[in-house]
């Protein structure tokens, strides 16, 4: 069974480190549990479960999670060239619109909420660790494992903070709550923070068992996989002021390769047979899932259960059977990026060509233009295009499912939703809800991280090519989307090939890897962070913005500023709670 991420309200009332709507820095003990209870297995498990529960939102699974989505659709995709904000126009969730056009400041509420809730999550881990450290193995069963699990979770929360905000305060369970406001956010730089987090993951991996009795509980290979991710980020050495990538740390890259090999050698992971299985609940804890946030439905908590509230603003709107708010829409550039050449390989010159599948709506009829070029089949696994079959829904194809088509176009996101006729979808509000897990790390990541490390090392490029081709082969053998009116035909001219050995230089391999990461991981909350890690955010985003201005006037003032926009500003509220100790990230206005 899944590890349960739910807690009774009475326990929430006595947590010694609760969170309110002000700041994690302002917390005071709200109650206490006896030492006898807290140093028992049952008492410790309550604190451990609270730290796990924070993966889905530390205040529980409610609508408030929309303001700090754990899926990072706002912070990692709308901020990139992959997606538009969507919804009911630029004024609808204007704070996210500001992220999209690079016009954020330290007063942005979505940033303050994200910071606050991630630190609440860190605080839960510290609370559990403090109790676990003070107890003995005789008092608490599985004590060593629980300590390691909490360190992995804490490192996960800190990693999110680091890649979002750069300048962050770091404290562990040995720091008292009342001392939190006295810790500066520039005591450790990015490299030092990532070193700490990678070490925590490695130390935890030495203790954790290879398997756990409950699905969702952290084990050895989750820690190793996450260590690989952190070390891959750290390998790209950044200038502290400009955020430019100045060098590559080859020792760290070799460690990434070794860690990925250990995960693969475990024999427990593989790619799912069909890409579309990633969005089916039957496969959510299958062979591709390495680390996932576990969700549940109709479990007796909240209105629908511990569902993924992070994405519930994003269910298709308009006339769709989901009746949703229609946020988070795929960009035209992402659609175009799926075009392939005559060999089924990515068309690296797609931006110099007409838009693929651009739509016109006349009355109630859509016309899709320029649909003769070949495309990667993952396009229609990821994007809901007008007139194209939507999953297994038989009543009609994707149609007018976007709320503000004049601003954002006609395409919607197909990932992360179960088909509307499925019994796995919740009936009624919240719209489109299901208990589909959120994949933090999946096996495709392991393959692509290893390939990236090998390419940057300039070593064993052939193996890197084979790893990329593994991912492409899975897409090639997946069941293609069929024409809605004639299921004997494919919905598009799908063509995907494998990279040959000829011409596979380091430069070409790097471009191929980065394109593959985009196509395979589209809309999974990682794109913007990838661009920053690779040191290509300024060029990529300003080229994208220049093209978008032609069709979307709200991009008129948008501009990515190097040395600033790689990271979000430290929130103003948090500066106040630190008694003025925090320093702001480069390029942003001083705190007020």
Name what the model sees in each region.
Residues 20-92, 202-203, 217-224, 229-403, ...:
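An aromatic- and glycine-enriched ligand-binding surface/loop that stacks and positions planar moieties
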Residues 1-7:
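Bacterial N-terminal signal peptides that target proteins for export
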Residues 8-16:
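Bacterial N-terminal signal peptides
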Residues 40-41, 45-49, 53-59, 64, ...:
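Conserved, well-structured interaction surfaces
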Residues 3, 16-39, 155, 197, ...:
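Bacterial Sec-dependent N-terminal signal peptides
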Residues 19-20, 76, 118-121, 192, ...:
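Long, intrinsically disordered, low-complexity segments
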